[in-house]
């Protein structure tokens, strides 16, 4: 399975190599070509209308210096503290640049290891997982070397030096997988909430407005859950934190 993943990445890098060159010559031209191949309509940067068009405009023209800090799972903690939201941060057990230095013998029974610059660079120890020290070190060292392709215009990734963190394992009271709430904010105001379920099995996404009315046809390539998702009791609090954290940005997704 790992060999297949590695080969897919190699093939992807080869296919996208010309686009990496094009991005250096003309970022606008590069994103226009990739956008058309993916979305099947022309990218309008002069007067963007759709959400996807506006994301490309932000990548090209909105160089907010906070973006790199907020894209890294460790450095974002400082930003959260400065926004006076430090109480919502998960407990940090350890951080460092060398996975060999992780204090394995002193870790709790349950924990999560993350490399800070990728969305899938996670190792979850739920108390029963069979994970060897050598396996953790090997995976983390590989992930630390991962680079983001420049052709996507995501300049904010890779600015901060990636590191390894160990965080507290968070679990739900009913032993179900945690629901992941992502709040889409525009000019510092929450407008939409995405709820991710079954992330590690059959990933599903449901979308709601801030009154918890379901938003149909808002998918991002994943199916809806088909289940009733109750309005969180702390929704107002969740939206207020999202409002405070997104204030410095014209658009932000607060997870």
Describe each PLM feature range.
Residues 107, 132-221:
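Phosphate-binding site of ATP-dependent enzymes
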